[in-house]
Amino acid sequence: MKLNSANINVMVKACRKASKVLIRDFGEIEKLQVSLKGPGDFVTASDKRVEKILIEELQKARPDYSILSEEIGEINNDKSFRWIIDPIDGTANFLHGIPHFAISIGLEKEKEIICGIIYDPIKDEMFVAEKGNGSYLNNQRMRVSSRKKLKDCIIFTGGPRNNSKNRELSLKEYVNFSSKVLLPVRKLGSAALDMAYV
């Protein structure tokens, strides 16, 4: 079984290149806390820099594929293949100097996700999953836990966002769910990494 397909290799290369900018920018966050412009503007600029590198690398390797990205939206409109990009998943963590964020890229073929990667540049953890080929962390095969009972599990959740229109309702549902399951519930601030750790 081939560990990484050509498309996975393209995504890995793009992530590694973009992560250099992301790590540099993350190191500058502390200095920006006292600047006049503000750290929020810096994060937006960092998001755009990382996104630009990802798009350039992906388009260079696969010019016919379309791209859906968080910052700029849709590029091209190829119905067959589409890259889906989140340049910084866990932006609030990034902004506050918390080293728990990731770059994520998925590849959709005819509206079905066929592969994806989640890269934590701080820990140098590369999660790779491909339909029919399994999932890997730094080239080591990942296995599903043998736990069968919900009471033995830990739940990761995204919870309501601060800017959600239905935030109050979402928060009530979140608290209601958390109190019913009586299990350890985690919300670490990067949905992509949280899913990878499940």
Task: Place the predicted regions along the sequence by residue.
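DPxDG-like acidic metal-binding loop motif
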Residues: 77-136
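Active-site/binding-pocket entry motifs
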Residues: 28, 73, 135, 161-162
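N-terminal subdomain of lithium-sensitive/metallo-dependent phosphomonoesterases centered on the IMPase/IPPase/PAP
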Residues: 1-88
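Short, solvent-exposed loop/turn motifs
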Residues: 113, 141-143
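Short glycine/threonine-rich catalytic loop with a Thr-x-Gly-x-Asp
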Residues: 47, 94-95, 188, 192
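An extended, acidic
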Residues: 143-198
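Residue-level signal for inorganic ion chemistry
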Residues: 22, 47, 58, 91, ...
